[in-house]
Amino acid sequence: MKNNINILLINGPNLNLLGTRETEIYGDITLPDLLKNLEKRAKKLNMSLKHIQSNAEHVLIDKIHSSRKNINYIIINPAAFTHTSIAIRDALIAVEIPFIEIHISNIYSREDFRSHSWLSDISQGVICGLGLDGYHWALETISNRLIHLK
């Protein structure tokens, strides 16, 4: 494999509570444990994984803006911001970094208000309803797109 690929993983509000919050929906693996597993996989794929989790929209937007020059791809689980944040949408459009939107649960089989995403139509793809495996599939997809298909 060639050059290292820099990936930014963004986790939105309440994802800091993974492993303890609604485990029947989100599972019992904590965010630190998930990140440890993802970092191992990313390393095997010759990727460098940077991570941010915030419950504050402006913090995520600032991180997206600062990633413009040094990030090749974004994986974003916007959580509740999926359904409300035109500001995150605009930030992603502005930086022109390709991204994959992911959701642990199937947002289309839950409450009606969760079925609209402000990001899906501008993303490279959406992974939802596959649990924490969705994060791993996002890494594999990026590897296929940026490394193996060059």
Curated annotation (Swiss-Prot):
Does the UniProt entry include the keyword DNA repair?
A: no
Q: Which PROSITE patterns match?
A: DEHYDROQUINASE_II
Query: Which key words are in the record?
Result: Amino-acid biosynthesis, Aromatic amino acid biosynthesis, Lyase
List the pathway annotation.
Metabolic intermediate biosynthesis; chorismate biosynthesis; chorismate from D-erythrose 4-phosphate and phosphoenolpyruvate: step 3/7
Task: Name its GO BP terms in alphabetical order.
Answer: amino acid biosynthetic process; aromatic amino acid family biosynthetic process; chorismate biosynthetic process; quinate catabolic process
Quote one Gene Ontology molecular function term: 3-dehydroquinate dehydratase activity
According to its UniProt record, the EC number is 4.2.1.10
Record-annotated active site? 26 (proton acceptor), 103 (proton donor)
Quaternary assembly: Homododecamer.
Which residues hold substrate? 77, 83, 90, 104-105, 114
Question: Which residues are annotated as site, described as Transition state stabilizer?
Answer: 21
**What Pfam families does this protein's entry cite?**
DHquinase_II
Which PANTHER family does the annotation name? CATABOLIC 3-DEHYDROQUINASE
Please give the name of this protein: 3-dehydroquinate dehydratase
Q: What does this protein do?
A: Catalyzes a trans-dehydration via an enolate intermediate.
Provide the family line. Belongs to the type-II 3-dehydroquinase family.
Keyword Ion transport set for record:
no
Reactions catalysed according to its record: 3-dehydroquinate = 3-dehydroshikimate + H2O
